[in-house]
């Protein structure tokens, strides 16, 4: 949710902090600020609104000289969005500045204790308690490191902390518990950040902090300690993303760029994992014996990743002839799930840091289940805590609304199904070879789908003024409709719902009236006739229908409605891989017509790292 960046080195810190914060904007925020230590003095500037306003206010950082600093983009949890509640927060003495992502659960008790000791609070936030409490401990012991140790034993809850002290002009201190934070290693300079995108211009060598760790950064190096203050050797990861992968590259929005990157992203996620016509998952450590002995299979995810899981449920059940349960991570962790030794939990997550998903993973692991994660970010928390990891290799995804991460997750999940199916002997040769053939052809076929962008942009004009849009579909099309509906509502702010077509008569059809926009998905060939009957049904109530079907059924659908989008014919289980692109483009162009902030929709964050 919130974004953190910190720097210690030889360069002007403010310049690096502002650049890092701009690269963290996609995570969502309502205010931003930086604090810099120069000449033994902490200087701070923070403001409600965009980082651009902060940049202007500080004259591109020139008003805050110094080579040590921290920055923050805030997503309000305690206290309304305003200048005072924005981070960083300073201690009463002016010695400490703190940035924080997470929630300090016992902050009210701590605040009352500090007020009794004479501390006066300026904000409504839980974070200011950290600054004041650290100041209190430091005034008692006189040592930054010891004061930090006391602080971490006093606070309860989740936190990623970046802290600087006026008395230590070459020290940046960081701590992590249940909130993501990474370290960046440079030459005569070092960094902290919530996300690698903030650092990619400055370093490719990073390490992810683990829960309970404390890091002390200086120009010369980084020292990391565990909860018992024992030194920890961190594994370095080299980031192979190109700098321009986190730039718009001539596109109006990151979302459009990332939609158009999907053919290449799917090719990267799949091509190296298919050799000689067979799926080869060399990064999977499960033995054939373990695969055949699997008990229950769960897919656990949130948001769009959950919709990938819905598609995966249909496809895995077909390929494995086993029941697969799909669970929302936020529900799974509290549901007392029936999961244990021998069961497989497939965790799907883009960032590898989503709190609910991480908590569900830990709950399943505690009960003895094997964890296989499908994630994008190498070395992320979910990846590190899983028994097996299949990376999607999608590269950085900056727009809040996911596109290429969704597509690559689905591609990897299909490969996993084929691999398991071959080992278990449950997928027939004809289906297996057709799937492999069409997976390799997906990038080219997806490019054909994306070529309909101009047509979709024209259709979007008719939707832009609507208050409600309904999606309907059966089977795989229903799973796909959930994602189409989510994309539309999250970036265009139009109310949208997705319904299983067979449920229309059970209440939904009462919402259909003259002119109601209905997007009918009918790509799944075996159920095309039933899908057509549902189109007729809603048209009889006055619905204005946009249909999405395959090229094979285009003419039949045109007999019922003049607004038809098509996808090439492929093996039916792969149709959602093609069908999602027109829905993404439709949502994008509708939002564009409505003048919405497409890359950073209101009230949304890219990575949800608090409850």
Residue ranges and their predicted role:
Residues 7-10, 100, 120, 137-141, ...:
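Hydrophobic alpha-helical scaffolding
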Residues 67, 71-84, 275-289, 312-348, ...:
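Glycine-rich oxoanion-binding loops at beta->alpha junctions
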């Amino acid at each position: 949710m919130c974004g953190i960046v910190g720097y210690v080195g030889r360069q002007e810190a403010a310049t690096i902090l502002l650049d890092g914060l701009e690269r963290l904007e996609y995570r969502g925020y309502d205010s931003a600020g930086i604090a810099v230590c120069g000449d033994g003095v902490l200087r701070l500037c923070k403001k409600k609104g965009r980082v651009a306003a902060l940049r202007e206010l500080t004259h591109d950082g020139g008003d805050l000289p110094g080579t040590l600093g921290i920055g923050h983009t805030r997503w309000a949890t305690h206290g309304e969005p305003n200048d005072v509640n924005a981070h960083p927060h300073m201690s009463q003495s002016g010695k400490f500045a703190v940035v924080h992502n997470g929630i300090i659960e016992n902050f009210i008790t701590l605040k009352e204790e500090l007020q009794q000791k004479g501390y006066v609070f300026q904000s409504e936030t839980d974070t200011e308690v950290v600054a004041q409490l650290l100041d209190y401990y430091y005034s008692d012991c006189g040592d930054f490191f010891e004061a930090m140790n006391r602080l971490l034993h006093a606070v309860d809850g989740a936190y990623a902390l970046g802290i600087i002290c006026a008395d230590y002009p070459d020290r940046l201190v960081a701590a992590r518990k249940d909130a993501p934070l990474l370290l960046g290693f440079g030459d005569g300079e070092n960094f902290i950040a919530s996300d690698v995108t903030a650092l990619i211009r400055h370093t490719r060598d990073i390490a992810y902090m683990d829960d309970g760790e404390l890091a002390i950064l200086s120009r010369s190096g980084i020292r990391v300690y565990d909860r018992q203050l024992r030194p920890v050797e961190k594994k370095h990861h080299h980031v192979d993303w190109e700098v321009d992968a986190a730039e718009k590259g001539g596109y109006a929005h990151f979302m459009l760029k990332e939609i158009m990157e999907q053919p290449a992203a799917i090719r990267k996620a799949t091509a190296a994992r298919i050799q000689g016509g067979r799926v080869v998952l060399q990064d999977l450590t499960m033995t054939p014996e373990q695969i055949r002995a699997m008990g229950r299979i769960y897919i656990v995810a949130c948001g769009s990743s959950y919709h990938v899981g819905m598609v995966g449920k249909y496809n895995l059940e077909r390929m494995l002839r086993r029941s697969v349960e799909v669970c929302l991570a936020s529900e799974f962790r509290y549901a007392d799930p029936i999961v244990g030794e021998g069961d497989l939990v497939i965790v799907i997550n883009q960032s590898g840091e989503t709190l609910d998903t991480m908590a569900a993973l830990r709950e399943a692991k505690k009960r003895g289940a094997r964890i296989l994660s499908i994630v994008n970010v190498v070395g992320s928390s979910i990846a590190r805590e899983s028994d097996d990891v299949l990376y999607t290799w999608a590269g950085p995804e900056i727009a809040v609304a996911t596109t290429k991460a969704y597509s690559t997750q689905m591609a990897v999940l299909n490969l996993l199904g084929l691999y398991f199916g071959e080992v278990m002997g449950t997928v027939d040769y004809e289906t297996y070879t057709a799937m492999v053939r069409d997976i390799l052809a997906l990038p080219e076929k997806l490019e054909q789908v994306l070529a309909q962008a101009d047509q979709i942009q024209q259709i979007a004009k008719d939707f832009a003024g609507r208050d409600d849009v309904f999606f309907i579909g059966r089977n795989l099309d229903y799973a796909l409709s959930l994602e189409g509906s989510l994309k539309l509502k999250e970036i265009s702010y139009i109310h949208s719902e997705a319904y299983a077509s067979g449920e229309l008569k059970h209440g939904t059809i009462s919402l259909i009236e003259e002119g109601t926009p209905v997007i009918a998905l009918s790509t799944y060939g075996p159920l095309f006739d039933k899908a057509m009957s549902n189109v007729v049904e809603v048209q009889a109530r006055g619905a204005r229908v946009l249909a999405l079907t395959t090229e094979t059924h285009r003419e039949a659908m045109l007999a019922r409605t003049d607004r038809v989008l098509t996808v090439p014919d492929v093996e039916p289980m792969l149709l959602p891989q093609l069908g999602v692109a027109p829905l993404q483009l439709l949502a994008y162009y509708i939002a564009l017509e409505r003048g919405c902030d497409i890359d950073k929709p209101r009230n949304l964050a890219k990575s949800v790292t608090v409850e």
